């Protein structure tokens, strides 16, 4: 079957840069879906996206649908004809449904059957509907109309190119009649651009100063920004999201170095970086020490004969932004950070849980409780907790919400607070996302845990539990944040006692009955989700959860030990034995003796197992004290041979009551050794 290349390009006014890639990908996916539904084959696909266009190129697309056979089964033969061989209503109805005379129906089989070959349609007749359906299905939050037209799209459309081979696909979509003329750069080449062929699309537009390939523009910007930064003896800050957005703003990227007055460097650099990135889409430069340089890189959409004018224009535009940040910083520093707490008394954290200041006081007390238990200082943690929310009422954070915590750090430093107290004001929000940075100080860790735990207990205490898709207070993230800090920073905190203490801080604001248990279950459920993401089997998690460790660090150490144990050759057999022992002990009548009496042994394998258990117990006790769980399980794995020999030679449920009870006590000792780490029986 013959094939030709297909190109569709929809020209528009400037598309939203932040959604440009997702729109382009959805456009391609829609066309792929349409081609698959029509049974049309092709060899390759490519999507292009620029500020004023979305395009898809399909290589070697079949010129016609394949013919297909359709077989329709009708009523059984005995129901289709009466005793005299005359057709019944069932037969006549089936023929009518098929749109043919009964004589054209196959009557030779057990059922009536109509077979038909449907000829494939020319691809050119199918493409308009496929393209239009794809455009209509784009994920556009809000569509707009323009002029007096009824058509709707994310931006007004300006032109449409649709070529199949060398021919234009005759159609009208979104008020644009298809042709072969695109448009070049708005300033460098405002004239129409004739697209010679689908394969020549990129080169034809390149000649008109348009780089239609999003990834090519992105790479050019990234490489040139890096080169310019190096020339300035700096390193550019290039967040992927900003790079994507800038690549979505320009058709012909030309990065240029600009500068600003050094006096602005007295302002916290995070504020300057935030305003330059978010408002101006600039790439900021850092020196070798990570300090902001008084220079930045802008990406122009034009190759100017006088780039100095573009540079001067950007420097003029950024100055008021930086001046605002400077003003807010100076205004805030006119008073002590602690005085901002007064404003927070009138700011509601949650209607039933009080003000933001109330939360700060709770966090202060909880942080003071946590700090000494993780090796920190209670007084400094309490101080950091009390100051933790102050900057929320500052001018700086009011203008730049991203500065919360960071502004607090600078203001606390200016007030002469201890370094770890100042750092804790920023570290309380860590980790800010999956895989993000953790607190570097114990004071920061204490405040971060306290802040998240206070939110968890408070919101759970008023019954506002997260649902499947709704979690307005980010409780799942809070729980995961607590777990990450404790596990990755190796902080051994008793969560059971800590959560109970946190509950007492709310007084009558919450219903305390069962609250601590509910919060703890939620936290440890997040731990299960964390392990699943890491590829840890649920059975491993459950084997440790059965012991209900109070410390997340202890929990993790046990999980890692069980993971290592599962790789041992004895693991499967010992897991099965533990399950068998667990079942036997659960059926034992009365209480099981705490001690084993060798005088009741009547089999050499009992002596052997007892001796092996005694030796193992002696060996693993110091390991357990040091939480050397992997070593402990590795040592217990040596019990496999005496255990196997015991079960092969010994009947546990002996007729003699004393012998039977003693064997149960022996097995309880065996199981107790493994339960020192995890319930291995759950690994079966």
From Swiss-Prot:
The keyword Membrane does not apply. Keywords: Aminoacyl-tRNA synthetase, ATP-binding, Cytoplasm, Ligase, Nucleotide-binding, Protein biosynthesis. InterPro entries: DALR_anticod-bd, Gly-tRNA-synth_bsu, Gly-tRNA-synth_heterodimer. Pfam families: DALR_1, tRNA_synt_2f. PROSITE patterns: AA_TRNA_LIGASE_II_GLYAB (PS50861). The keyword Ribosomal protein does not apply. It comes from the Bacteria. Belongs to the class-II aminoacyl-tRNA synthetase family. This is Glycine--tRNA ligase beta subunit. The gene is glyS.
